[in-house]
């Protein structure tokens, strides 16, 4: 059963988003939305609590998911009334994270997020558990309050140290890729980032219609371009996540953001106000991690919208859009045009060199895109494309530049 409390009818919290999240792990059979101010004891109204308790008995509900953030006492009180496990939105997201955390780093990041969620609640959870077992509070009663709090703090410190070491490995790996142009994909879950990655690279990475299919970074080379351009996809954003959860995954987000070019991927079929809000969040997160790379705004799923919707997006959201392009990764619409835009915004320049130096020729073939290679009088006249700074450096170093 899914329950969502909204402050007013204008509250943008979405039961559809909660349902989409829940369906990753469970089979929701009932959804309830209540509009009212938060109740300090239950989060939702006490009258509704009584009615839900009856429904749970009648319909054999096994778990209740509340789409708001519960205090430990609210969770305890609801579990006591419902006699089944109760979790809130953050706990649901953490469980989804665990499902998709396949690497050591992803598992550590999920555990860190879980512990940072747990820390301010630790003392209260232990205190409540000692009052009597309720679903979801098992085991906490075995701890002394302060000892459990300190245990959580120590584990957080240990995980942060481990993640920093892994982060350093990432920096080394990024240096190894420095000779290639890099493109990072940023966006909300289900905007179609993974589908876009597949379309750009010709790969067939898992692309389920579920949130958080991608938790770790994935890097592939763009197909159909002579120059080697690497694209990185990473964890998608979701609404109302507290800062500590975003922070736990910053290292994977940074992997995309530390690129020569950023593609902000947006679901063009969303409502215009929703697109606006998500674009603002994307730019805020890029600003938070001090990303200075140029941006292309990729409106995916153009096959699902009308020309009029496209016009409205461009007119009404002009201040939030940088270098827009409308594509469909699924149906290969405008994907070649997107590749051209990527090359254009990577600030690639063209240079020409006349040389018979085999080491230089080998270097050019390995590190630049060769446009033309003409052999004349035992010398190669090579026209190549690379980052502007690299072209200038190569031409400067080579006295035979023409």
UniProtKB/Swiss-Prot annotation:
The record's subcellular locations are:
Cytoplasm
Known SUPFAM superfamilies for this protein?
P-loop containing nucleoside triphosphate hydrolases (SSF52540)
Task: Return the InterPro entries for the record.
Answer: G_HFLX_dom (IPR030394), GTP-bd (IPR006073), GTP-bd_M (IPR032305), GTPase_HflX (IPR016496), GTPase_HflX_N (IPR025121), GTPase_HflX_N_sf (IPR042108), P-loop_NTPase (IPR027417), Small_GTP-bd (IPR005225)
Cofactors, names only: Mg(2+)
* Family annotation (Gene3D superfamilies): 6.10.250.2860, GTPase HflX, N-terminal domain (3.40.50.11060), P-loop containing nucleotide triphosphate hydrolases (3.40.50.300)
- The main place the protein resides is cytoplasm
Q: Where is the Hflx-type G domain?
A: 181-350
Record-annotated residues binding GTP? 187-194, 212-216, 233-236, 300-303, 328-330
Binding positions (Mg(2+)): 194, 214
Q: Which GO terms describe its cellular component?
A: cytoplasm
GO MF, one annotated term:
metal ion binding
Keyword field: Cytoplasm, GTP-binding, Magnesium, Metal-binding, Nucleotide-binding
Role, per record: GTPase that associates with the 50S ribosomal subunit and may have a role during protein synthesis or ribosome biogenesis.
Regarding protein family, the annotation reads:
Belongs to the TRAFAC class OBG-HflX-like GTPase superfamily. HflX GTPase family.
Q: How does it assemble?
A: Monomer. Associates with the 50S ribosomal subunit.
PANTHER family, alphabetized: GTP-BINDING PROTEIN HFLX (PTHR10229), GTPASE HFLX (PTHR10229:SF8)
What is the name listed in the Swiss-Prot or TrEMBL entry for this protein?
Answer: GTPase HflX
From what organism does this protein derive? Methanocaldococcus jannaschii (strain ATCC 43067 / DSM 2661 / JAL-1 / JCM 10045 / NBRC 100440)
Please name the taxonomic classification of the source: Archaea, Methanobacteriati, Methanobacteriota, Methanomada group, Methanococci
